[in-house]
Amino acid sequence: MIRLRRAHLAFLVLCLAAPAAIGASCTCGDGDSQSETSGGAAGGGGGTGVGGEGGSLFGNDAGDAGCVDGEACGDGGICAGGVCCEAGQACGAACCGGVEVCSFQQCVVPGAVCIDATECPDGHYCEYALGEPSDGGVADAGCQGGASLATGKCLPKPPECAPGQEPGPNDPLTCLSKCEYMPPVGAFSPVLKYSWGDPAAPQTRDSVMMAPVIAQLDDDTCDGVVDERDIPEIIFMTFTGGAYNDNGTIHAISVVNGAFVEKWSANAGVTSPNHPGRSIAAGNIDGVPGNEIVVCTVDKRVRAYDAAGAQLWLSAPGSECFMPSIADLDQDGLPEVVVEGQILNGADGSQKVPAFDPPNTMNIVVSDMDGDGFLDIVTADKVYRADGTMIATTGLGGRYPAVGDLDKDGVPEIIASEYQNHKLFVWHLDPNAPNGVQIIRQDIDINGDLNPGLCPVGSAGAIRGGGPPTVADFNGDGFPDAALAGGVGYAVLDGTKLMDPATPDAETFLWIKQTQDCSSAATGSSVFDFEGDGIAEVVYGDEVTLHVYAGPDGADLFQTCNTNGTLFEYPLVADVDNDGQADIVVVSNSYSGFNCAGEKTSGVRVFGDANGNWVRTRRVWNQHGYHVTNVAEDGTIPAVEPPNYTQPKLNNFRQNVQPLGEFSAPDLVITLAPRCIGDYALMARVRNIGEAAVPAGVPVGFYAGDPGAGGIQLAGSPLVTTKVLYPAEAEDLLLELPDAPTGVKDGSVPIYAVVDDNAPPHTWHECREDNNKVMASGACTTPR
């Protein structure tokens, strides 16, 4: 059963003159829009709280004073504060004057003209009903959506209702109540949403065998900025003919009109060709607005591309480039690019710190390990300061690290795989211990009770094993756990038991599941809490199968064919189409002999929940060592990165999250009134009074009579919304009716508007759906 957190949801009351698209002023509409359950409009054109914004959208002249608040007065006015006020200016007990508008029972002066909420002060939104519609103006050069810009004016966001202070059905509306949709737990139904690539392409040229990144590269919304409101790009490398170590082609694809579109691709040619088997990273590295991508080359250089796919710079040859990380190590606002052995200036690729580590270190991550407020460089067995000086070493070796505070004592642990001997290490800094480290675990065999002989003799899976670890709370006990893949299995180890010296190594396993990765035995994984219940699920792909495992016991919640020669890549989770739902992004390739009963896959695929029940998540995953606090959703790299392991609801690694508002949902309401100047028309204003955005394309039906009781849909209906509606935002839809039925025009037949009409299938859920219909009169008063 769907779980809804149903509280009374108040809604925005905005009394204003007609928008420019309707006419500067008019005296039309002799009745207020009403909800069938509300009992009519409140004083001041306010509506009541269940069925819509209520109230006439258009004002009338004031009449005599000395009236009773909330009652009609004069010639179409409403009494407010003992004064007969124009209907459009009445605001509870006040009568707004001059340029003021009524917003949630408060008279406010609209702020500056805006095209987006980012142009408004904090705590404000862009009210498009107060601005001008799109007029064909030229958008910025980076605009990819092809739309011109509408404008609005900044207004204060409505306050959130205090607990127990929600307005009653007929009370004045002063705040918005919490709006959340709670997905059903246990209903896990992934479906394929988008795909790019053909397993039968010539020379298997659509093969991908590296973890993609998700970042914003262009202005899809045409608001003049590239930010989290745009549709992110998926960036990845392909290779041809099985040559996964040479001549990679980088691609940027994105969802446009419900399908993948390739924005650009680039091949560097024979001079320093891109390495298609190495990781990439994305973010704003040069201080200029917009994001860049950094990749490794075959000759161990680093190449940077701008957002349009043009080369920005190419570094000098280095000791190694394997998994680039982007971070602002010296907190000067200009990020660095950190690769195995050196640190580069993000702006131009020049060397900032010379070689400081042997090139056989195959992965680095960044995190503040000693609590001094500055990021450190972390390998499987060493920690360095940002200037390249070593803080400590275990001497154990190892390949892939992750960071998390397993016992939540404020001292972070390094969880590392030792690939050569399929071992797991756990250690942390301790200035009072030998070599400055305390080794907590060093001999855990990640194969557990699985036999390496499940892989062919001599294969990587039979001898070695251990991919990049993840850190997350898999069993819901409030403490993070560790997980990683090997050649024959995927293992989750209990973080509390790992930190307990009395627990034998073999008893630290929470669970282990047999898998098949004999070729590399080093694949990674990612983590996400799809149902928002506080328990993480594992997303993992081996040579033939994409799996989603339940965190507590490893139950296989989902599996599907996904052929992959494997290196150290992993599937990841992000919102790639900006629909407010998490998506799984997985890569595959067809060059090898791996198949599923003859079937192969290749390229990039995106899976989502069939019923739209996965919770919200971020629209970014910018590097292999992603850990949330390392990047903002718009790709900005923080000058001072807060430690992930100290942040509420985090303390994880390679797990995407929505730290705040993961259950936030939209809530659409609607008002309706006639247009009486010029040709007759009906205008519906659709407003989102929820806490999450709703995509464009929501149908709005117009009816003569109640559609639930045989009402007739009017000609030209339904219309659809044309823009994403973020919380508090509205859009006006105009239904031209030059030949409107007589009963509609004279008011003898009530008019109705329904938002999300007929509830077509979509992946978003409102926190309530009983406020989507509104009734009004279509009659016009005689102009004075």
Where are these regions (language model features)?
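Short domain-boundary/entry signatures in modular proteins, especially
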Residues: 64-66, 82-90, 106-115, 155-162, ...
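Disulfide-bonded cysteine-rich modules in secreted/extracellular proteins
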Residues: 67-71, 87-96, 111-120, 160-171, ...
